Structures are given as structure tokens and as C-alpha cells.
Design a protein with these regions (language model features):
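Short, functional N-terminal and low-complexity linear motifs
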Residues: 1, 24-32, 79-83
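AMP-dependent adenylate-forming
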Residues: 3-5, 27-50
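Structured binding elements
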Residues: 97
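Short beta->alpha connector loops at strand-helix junctions that form conserved
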Residues: 103-105
Length: 110
């Protein structure tokens, strides 16, 4: 199978990641914050966010969630469209030691 999406990867981005090198996605994020603080994480409507901003924002939100008294491993539902705030929220939940439950915002009652 041809992996055509690999053609859109910027130079230096590996095509494969060894999943055993990280204990969790949170650990992958922490390494990304250290290595790529000034590199772009996302862009939306010409507003760029780098990994340093992601670290700062997700850390603040994660601390807020912990301040609510949630127990480690608690499930946190995230109902957001595909916007940069989703990445911030997901990183915050994982870094705080919780489990992400992604909920499609297009779901209806029926």
C-alpha cells in the first residue's frame, strides 16, 4: 500500500515512530515540548500555536482539572470540533493523568 500522506510530511519528520519508546502519550508530549518548543503545533485561521504554547496552555488547564478533585484515571469527555483547542484540551487531560473520552460534537439526541 502506498502511503501517499507521507509526501506531505515536512523534512526531518520520521515516517514511523517506535511506540515502545514512550510509556504513554503524555510522555511523548513532554518530549515534544522539550525538543520542539518553538516549532509549530497547529494553525487555524492564520493563528499559529507552537509546542511551547501548547505546553503552557495544557499545563494550566490540567492544573485546573486537578483542582476540581478528579481522581487519577478519571474519564474526561471532550466535545470539541477539529480546532486547536481540542489539542490543548486533550494534552491537558492526558498530562493531568486522566483518560480522554472523545465525543463527536455532531452527535444528536437520536
Amino acid at each position: 500500500m502506498e502511503k501517499i500522506w507521507l509526501k506531505s510530511y515536512p523534512p526531518g519528520v520520521p515516517h514511523d515512530v517506535n511506540p515502545e519508546q514512550y510509556r504513554s502519550v503524555a510522555h511523548l508530549l513532554e518530549e515534544s515540548f522539550r525538543k520542539h518548543a518553538k516549532s509549530p503545533f497547529s494553525v487555524c485561521m492564520d493563528r499559529w500555536m507552537n509546542y511551547g504554547e501548547l505546553e503552557r496552555l495544557s499545563g494550566a488547564l490540567g492544573a485546573y482539572l486537578q483542582g476540581l478533585g478528579l481522581q487519577p484515571g478519571a474519564r474526561v469527555a471532550i466535545m470539541l470540533p477539529n480546532i486547536p483547542q481540542f489539542g490543548v484540551t486533550m494534552a491537558a487531560v492526558l498530562r493531568a493523568g486522566y483518560t480522554c473520552v472523545n465525543v463527536n460534537p455532531l452527535y444528536t439526541a437520536r
